[in-house]
Amino acid sequence: MKRTVGLLGILLIVCAGFAFAAGGSHSGGSQTGDVVFWTSHGPPANGTLEKIVNNYNATNPAVKVKFVQVPGSETDNTALMTAVRGGTGPDVYMLDRFIVAQRAADGILEDLTAVINKVDPNFKDKVLPFAWNEAQFRGKTYAFPFDTDTRGIFYNIDMLRAAGIDPAVMDRSKGPITIDQLREICRKIDTKDAQGNYTKVGFIPQYGQGWHYTWGFDFGGSFADLKAGKVTPTNPGVVAGFQFLYDWNKEMGVQQVQNFISSYAPPNNPPQNEPFITGNMAMMINGDWMVNTFERYAPDMHWGVTYIPVPKAGDKPTTWAGGWSMVVPTGSKRIDGAVRFMTYICGEAGQRLYFVENGNAPTLLALLNEKGLFPANKQYFQETLGFTQSRPALPVGALYWDALSTAQDMVVQNVQTPQQALQQVINQVQPQLDKFLPLQ
């Protein structure tokens, strides 16, 4: 608590002299009017974000923050890029942290290095190392880390019991189960109707947070060699993870899996209709935010969470962490006010409320180490931060993600082999990465 309060206190002291932070081109910019804050987050996260804004405005009446929800996603920042290039961008934008490097390379983010060094030269030591690293590009800082998250396999206890499976098999004190064990469990749960369509499934590996990074890391893969300046989607571990996706979908039936997802998890599916909640899916890979979803929409559901299944017995568990950040888009005329708000929302007050209401873990070490902050049903996620991996911070991070996602679609549909699909990722991404070499 004291460390972040100190950070805010220092900011307030030096705020009057913050013209240095923006550079000469902004030194004469207007510091009047609202600070405009954009996010692409929808419910329930946007409600919590708006509450943080309201709390800030209540104690900072001189320059208020205007909360605006805009279209977008993790890698689709079209609205932001169009607005910045048209001179109508926001003052603060909530950006998926792993693509900070790419947006900095695109020239649409302000360099915040001087700001952070002036406010607190030791700020980097007060947040999770991987979160800080994701906020960097070529030795400069372009973002304030906000939240983080890790992943595990959730299991519906009642569905397991109904299939004659003792839920104790999932007890994480025993370590992760193997993928072969997972498949045997699922065969006892998978149920089809007279037309051959699934009405209940044990597990669909690409569902939820079953991304390329999830399974690539799980099979020991590496996605980039930063020293060599190479993306490495054909790394044997990544290929093995994609092969697992190919084989699982082939066994279940590619079309039957697609039919199930279309029926029980269509786009914009309300949270209360999540197939894990409705009793149509027994297990899924997902993140810590789901705990709050369960509490809100299925408080009586019996569930557990444990390590992502591993290829073979004795393998160490894996997970990966994501998370978001706050950035100042290029051209902001209210950088002083923007940074003041960013220090609040990314400080203890903002991160604490976001964790309590939305479930995403904080990046501030002071909060992560606070005794009693993590309730029992979230302690798994606190534990996994000790061994989590993170996506490589690349100036083509969004492009790489999208290319991997396309490859994953081709593989789960059994249209291409993993090697074919992942070679296309190299062909698409590496020439773009070459433009930014050397990376280190």
Placement of each model-derived feature along the sequence:
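Short, low-complexity disordered leader/linker segments with a strong preference
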Residues: M1-V36, A58, Q420, N427-Q440
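Short, well-ordered beta-strand elements
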Residues: Q31-G42, V63-V68, V92, Y142, ...
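Short, polar/charged alpha-helical segment
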Residues: G42-K64, D158, L404, L422
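Extracytoplasmic "Venus flytrap"/periplasmic binding protein-like
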Residues: N55-V127, K140-A143, R161-V169, E274-P275, ...
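Extracytoplasmic/periplasmic substrate-recognition and gating elements
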Residues: A58-K66, K250-Q255, E295-A361, T406, ...
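Hinge/lid segment of periplasmic solute-binding proteins
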Residues: R97-G152, I157, R161, D180-Q181, ...
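Long, aromatic- and glycine/proline-rich binding clefts that accommodate carbohydrate-like moieties
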Residues: K126, F130, P299, T306, ...
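Glycine-centered hinge/linker elements that transmit conformational signals in sensory
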Residues: R183-D190, K227-P266, I308
